[in-house]
Regions:
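Positively charged n-region of N-terminal signal peptides that target proteins for export
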Residues: 1-4
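Bacterial N-terminal signal peptides
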Residues: 6-15
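Metal-centered catalytic cores of metalloenzymes
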Residues: 16-85, 89-168
């Protein structure tokens, strides 16, 4: 009997030793990173040609989640329907090349524009200084450093009518 109890105690201890609770694996969560731009005609380079008293403005939001970027933009007070919208590389006050084209359409009211969509590496059209293609990581690095802007173009202002620096 004593031997049986001892044997059961050894088995119980062995079972406890091998069934230690294991820590739960870490859950990988990627928090969304958000950037914004306040669009204003006074930020555009070169300055747009506007009617007296006109002051186009707008907003753009970019949300990074994994390997893609979702965006929303809205502009108002434009001289006409939008013809294009882009993300460019460029410091404040400097014009730069297009790196990502954005979808934009005329809004429901005259002089307004809206755009919404998502882009990934296939939507990146920019080139690095060495001529190689930019990656999404290159675009995000430029956005994080404050060296990108978004603008909306119209037929009256082909270089751009309203612009905002992209900031965190």
């Amino acid at each position: 009997m004593r031997r049986a109890c001892l044997w059961m105690a050894v088995c119980a201890m062995a079972a406890c030793a091998t069934s230690q609770p294991q820590p739960e694996p870490a859950k990988v969560t990627t928090a969304a990173e958000t950037f914004q731009a306040k669009l204003d005609a006074r930020n555009e380079v070169p300055p747009p040609t506007l009617e007296s008293g006109a002051s186009p403005s707008g907003t753009a939001t970019f949300t990074v989640q994994g390997p893609s970027v979702a965006y929303k933009l809205a502009a108002m007070g434009l001289s006409g329907p939008p013809t294009a919208a882009h993300i460019h590389v460029g410091a404040p006050g400097a014009a730069g090349p297009v790196i990502v084209p954005l979808a934009v359409a005329a809004g429901s009211s005259p002089g307004t524009a809206t755009g919404e969509g998502t882009f990934d590496v296939s939507g990146v059209k920019g080139k690095k200084a060495d001529g190689s293609a930019m990656t999404l990581d290159d675009v995000l690095a430029a956005m994080r450093s404050g060296d990108t802007y978004v603008n909306v173009h119209t037929a009256n202002n082909k270089p751009g009518e309203v612009r905002g620096q992209i900031e965190k």
